[in-house]
Amino acid sequence: MTIALGRFTKEENDLFDIMDDWLRRDRFVFVGWSGLLLFPCAYFALGGWFTGTTFVTSWYTHGLASSYLEGCNFLTAAVSTPANSLAHSLLLLWGPEAQGDFTRWCQLGGLWTFVALHGAFGLIGFMLRQFELARSVQLRPYNAIAFSGPIAVFVSVFLIYPLGQSGWFFAPSFGVAAIFRFILFFQGFHNWTLNPFHMMGVAGVLGAALLCAIHGATVENTLFEDGDGANTFRAFNPTQAEETYSMVTANRFWSQIFGVAFSNKRWLHFFMLFVPVTGLWMSALGVVGLALNLRAYDFVSQEIRAAEDPEFETFYTKNILLNEGIRAWMAAQDQPHENLIFPEEVLPRGNAL
């Protein structure tokens, strides 16, 4: 019996090996397998947005001007959502709505679905890029896990929320002022600021900003060797091989300030990862709830008493009145296709009036 020892080697590389070698080659801008998803999707999403904000009107979908060509600026231009009558159509260029007519496709809001879907897959491609590079250089995948937070928010706000409503029309349009309008809509129709998931999201994002500022300041404060530079600017040398700040000193400082402090770098940095990512995920879950029209806190007893007693008001009841005002004033302008008309006497007024 013959026993062959050694490793099996293929005489010729197949197509997969050739592609793998080219895609993962060390170059200035890494491509990778994830790049096959990331780069085309990012290119089309950004290209669609620039095209829409430059040339495409929203007259046929919202009755609005939304492009530089019509006189908008960077803050007021937008790629607007399709009309409510188009419901959840993917609005493919070759679909039954546009039938291959590019101009008609733009007028119907096809660029919005184009940008939203390519944007979502572009973000997913960027997360996969972080996974791929982490594996290549033998890192843990925490960067990719952290980036799942922004992806969850994007998908929940731009895709899941309108899927739960009557159509893409109720998603945010892609523009600065358009996003502000969407925030006002969320407050008026969902009382979003009183939603506990929104509260957790705010705590996560602002808490992360606070942690970031404290951490950066503490590291700068506890440097014991800036480098061997003769002046301040050469001393902040980013190529130093070793850490030159004192965790012990930082621990002693914050122990005196708060009575407690991080004594372990891994726990400290994991906490800085955990706070914002958890906040983003919680806010995304809250938006999924809004897609199903789940309500925030309702303090009905205060509303009943405020209705019965003109002298009783709380900040909550005032906000509820403001929400009613947003709904009444906004709906007629925001949904012109409904032909809503509210007589003056039904528009909400505060107790003081």
UniProtKB/Swiss-Prot annotation:
Modified sites of kind N-acetylthreonine: 2
Membrane topology according to the record: Multi-pass membrane protein
Subunit structure: PSII is composed of 1 copy each of membrane proteins PsbA, PsbB, PsbC, PsbD, PsbE, PsbF, PsbH, PsbI, PsbJ, PsbK, PsbL, PsbM, PsbT, PsbX, PsbY, PsbZ, Psb30/Ycf12, at least 3 peripheral proteins of the oxygen-evolving complex and a large number of cofactors. It forms dimeric complexes.
Keyword Membrane attributed: yes
Annotated positions binding pheophytin a: 130, 143
Stored SUPFAM superfamilies: Bacterial photosystem II reaction centre, L and M subunits
Keywords: Acetylation, Chlorophyll, Chloroplast, Chromophore, Electron transport, Iron, Magnesium, Membrane, Metal-binding, Oxidoreductase, Phosphoprotein, Photosynthesis, Photosystem II, Plastid, Thylakoid, Transmembrane, Transmembrane helix, Transport
A matching Pfam family: Photo_RC
Membrane-spanning intervals of the chain: 41-61, 125-141, 153-166, 208-228, 279-295
Highest taxon above the source species: Eukaryota
Gene3D superfamilies in the record: Photosystem II protein D1-like
Reactions catalysed according to its record: 2 a plastoquinone + 4 hnu + 2 H2O = 2 a plastoquinol + O2
One GO MF term: electron transporter, transferring electrons within the cyclic electron transport pathway of photosynthesis activity
Enzyme Commission number, as recorded: 1.10.3.9
Other comments on record: 2 of the reaction center chlorophylls (ChlD1 and ChlD2) are entirely coordinated by water.
Co-factor remark: The D1/D2 heterodimer binds P680, chlorophylls that are the primary electron donor of PSII, and subsequent electron acceptors. It shares a non-heme iron and each subunit binds pheophytin, quinone, additional chlorophylls, carotenoids and lipids. There is also a Cl(-1) ion associated with D1 and D2, which is required for oxygen evolution. The PSII complex binds additional chlorophylls, carotenoids and specific lipids.
PANTHER family found in the cross-reference section: PHOTOSYSTEM II D2 PROTEIN, PHOTOSYSTEM II PROTEIN D1
Record function comment: Photosystem II (PSII) is a light-driven water:plastoquinone oxidoreductase that uses light energy to abstract electrons from H(2)O, generating O(2) and a proton gradient subsequently used for ATP formation. It consists of a core antenna complex that captures photons, and an electron transfer chain that converts photonic excitation into a charge separation. The D1/D2 (PsbA/PsbD) reaction center heterodimer binds P680, the primary electron donor of PSII as well as several subsequent electron acceptors. D2 is needed for assembly of a stable PSII complex.
Protein name: Photosystem II D2 protein
Residues the record lists as binding chlorophyll a ChlzD2: 118
Subcellular location: Plastid, Chloroplast thylakoid membrane
Residues the entry annotates as binding a plastoquinone: 215, 262
Binding residue positions for Fe cation: 215, 269
Principal location class: plastid
CDD domains, per database record: Photosystem-II_D2 (cd09288)
